[in-house]
Amino acid sequence: MDILQGIHAANDYERSLFGAVKEPFRAGLNRRYSDIRPDQVNNKFFEPTAEITVEDIQAAIDQQKRRGLNYVLFRMNQPMHPPCRDSFGFEKEVMYVMALRRDRSRLWQTNDSIVIRDIQSSDISADLLDVSCVPEQYRDAAYRNMKMVLDVAETHPEYHWLCANQDGNRVGTVYALEHEGFVEMDDLWVEEDYRHRKIGTTLMKYIAEHTEGILYLHADAAATPKDMYAKMGFEIVETVYEYYLEW
């Protein structure tokens, strides 16, 4: 299995934990959906396997509307053909899949005052479900999604949800999923008042030292963390293009 096959298999496994189903939608176009996480867009998208047409896009929009959804998301490994993109006014985002193919984690600087706890070995549910930092209008949705993740993490030993504490305060969290020689790291978050204190790298090094396999993550091509990841030894192994439309 090459590195991209392994990463794709790990991604599919992670989605399956949350009930995401993949099925053919039209020729050259697959659909992924999940009824388990109603507030999550990530597990509901269309995935072309060939160049898509305006008709494909319209069919996907019609399908989403029939399901009572107000958006459509296409995720692909090539840019969308400009006439298709411009006909509908998609918002575009580019994501990099970055993998640590040669382990350099021993060189990462950490913060020795940070205590890291894993849902697999600690009762940290209250800390993980704390949504006080989320804007009030989004708290209910955030809590529901976190509770679903917590339920999966508590019943699947390969799924790690880590909490970083300093002086008794939760200052950061991250997910990690082990699957057949690959480890996906996702949703690295550090409390705003505690940033630039090596908390993120402390969480990442903990994952590298306590899991087995090639560590990989997804980084926004337009954001600065990708540059930090590159300095840490992560390499871009795939570029993913996302096209989002809401009505």
Describe the residue ranges of each PLM region.
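Short amphipathic alpha-helix that is part of the acyltransferase structural core
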Residues: 1-14, 44-51, 96, 104-147, ...
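N-terminal charged segments
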Residues: 1-67, 144, 152-155
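Conserved acetyl-CoA binding element of GNAT-fold acetyltransferases
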Residues: 39-49, 181-192
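Acyl-donor-binding surface of acyltransferase catalytic domains
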Residues: 50-115, 120, 225, 243-245
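Conserved acetyl-CoA-binding loop-helix of GNAT-fold acetyltransferases
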Residues: 53-60, 190-192, 196-209, 231
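Conserved hydrophobic beta-strand within the GNAT/NAT acetyltransferase core sheet
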Residues: 74, 185, 215-220
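Conserved acetyl-CoA-binding loop of GNAT-fold acetyltransferases
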Residues: 86-92, 230-239
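A conserved beta-strand-loop-helix scaffold within acyl/acetyltransferase catalytic domains
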Residues: 141-189
